[in-house]
Amino acid sequence: VCNAAVNPFHGSALDIPDTAFDRIMECNIRSNSWLCNMAIPGMIEQKDGVLIIVSSIGGIRGSKELGAYSISKAADMQIVRNYAVEFGPDNIRANCIAPGLIITDFARALYEDPERRDNRESATPLRRLGDPDEIAGAAVMMASPAGSYLTGQTLVIDGGTTIQP
């Protein structure tokens, strides 16, 4: 399971420094690729394996302030599709989880501010934030026999946020 994310910049795509853009891509994309590429040879040898990348709903939504982060998370979704096609014949499955706002250290600034939290919860049909166990449960399913015919997919777990108009 790959779960890498940094976002040192909030603002317009016109203003992001190259160093911030590079850091986002290095951590959020390249590190996932490296980890998968280290694991895949052993999976090929045993003709079995599961790759899971934790992405974000940012990868399927546009953003005025999180553009580079969103680009990196969309890339995660494409990585699993490519790995699924390339390594599926070796019985290696690759899938992605795209969480909405989950109560984690990474999202602390979004949920500790009462106004921001209220805004996010009111924009979510379930009217709450997600719990890390809800993401972990999806990863367990993907890695278990219950997920044995699932590959190349992105599972959105966001309390319904992305279905809102």
Predicted regions and their residues:
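C-terminal helical subdomain
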Residues: 33, 96-99, 118-146, 150, ...
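Substrate-binding pocket helix/loop in short-chain dehydrogenase/reductase
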Residues: 11-13, 17-22, 120
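Active-site loop immediately N-terminal to the catalytic Tyr-X3-Lys motif
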Residues: 14, 61-67, 89-90, 127, ...
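Active-site helix of classical SDR
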Residues: 36, 72, 80
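Alpha-helical segment proximal to the catalytic Tyr-Lys
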Residues: 41, 85-89, 148
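Short C-terminal tail/terminal secondary-structure segment
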Residues: 10, 61, 140, 151-165
